[in-house]
Amino acid sequence: MAAAAAGPGAPLSADELLPKGDAEKPEEELEEEDDEELDETLSERLWGLTEMFPERVRSAAGATFDLSLFVAQKMYRFSRAALWIGTTSFMILVLPVVFETEKLQMEQQQQLQQRQILLGPNTGLSGGMPGALPSLPGKI
């Protein structure tokens, strides 16, 4: 204040240049003011942001969201039904065929092993006729 008394052309001190309103308040009061400003929730802030768009844009965005939600629900229901139909059809139509082929292969493997045991090890490889004599070793 002494500088103000010295005259209008006198240089000001650093204390006089700083703003006095916030400098006198303690930090706790400043934090409380910030907390008071942040009391609104995220949904309130988002709702407040919608007011900056015209009603026509908001209604179009809402209709688009509703339509996309409806389509997503329909696609989900359809995919569930299609998956159920595909899975049950596979189990009824394809699995019995797979099991029978596996059973047939196992029976053929057992017959081949029995033939090897009864007729010798080369019989299974040459695929000779049943009841025929085994081939002589060393001759093809």
Swiss-Prot record:
Domain of life: Eukaryota
Matches recorded under Pfam families: Tom22 (PF04281)
Keywords linked to the UniProt accession: Membrane, Mitochondrion, Mitochondrion outer membrane, Phosphoprotein, Protein transport, Receptor, Translocation, Transmembrane, Transmembrane helix, Transport
Ranges of the Cytoplasmic topological domain: 1-81
GO CC annotations, alphabetized: mitochondrial outer membrane translocase complex
Membrane disposition: Single-pass membrane protein
Bias-annotated ranges (Acidic residues): 25-40
Residues covered by region (TMD): 81-101
TM region(s), chain numbering: 82-101
Mitochondrial intermembrane side: 102-140
Residues the record lists as Phosphothreonine modifications: 41
Modified residues (Phosphoserine): 13, 43
Any one Gene Ontology molecular-function term assigned to this protein's record: mitochondrion targeting sequence binding
Compartments it resides in: Mitochondrion outer membrane
GO biological process: protein insertion into mitochondrial outer membrane; protein targeting to mitochondrion
This protein's domain notes: The N-terminal domain (residues 1-60) is important for binding to the unfolded mature imported proteins. Residues (47-69) of the cytoplasmic domain interacts with TOMM20 while the C-terminal segment (residues 61-80) binds presequence of preproteins. Requires the transmembrane domain (TMD), a short segment (the import sequence) in the cytoplasmic domain localizing separately from the TMD and the C-tail signal in the C-terminal domain for efficient targeting and integration into the TOM complex.
Family recorded in the similarity comment: Belongs to the Tom22 family.
General function of this protein: Central receptor component of the translocase of the outer membrane of mitochondria (TOM complex) responsible for the recognition and translocation of cytosolically synthesized mitochondrial preproteins. Together with the peripheral receptor TOM20 functions as the transit peptide receptor and facilitates the movement of preproteins into the translocation pore. Required for the translocation across the mitochondrial outer membrane of cytochrome P450 monooxygenases.
Protein name, entry field: Mitochondrial import receptor subunit TOM22 homolog
Species annotation: Bos taurus (Bovine)
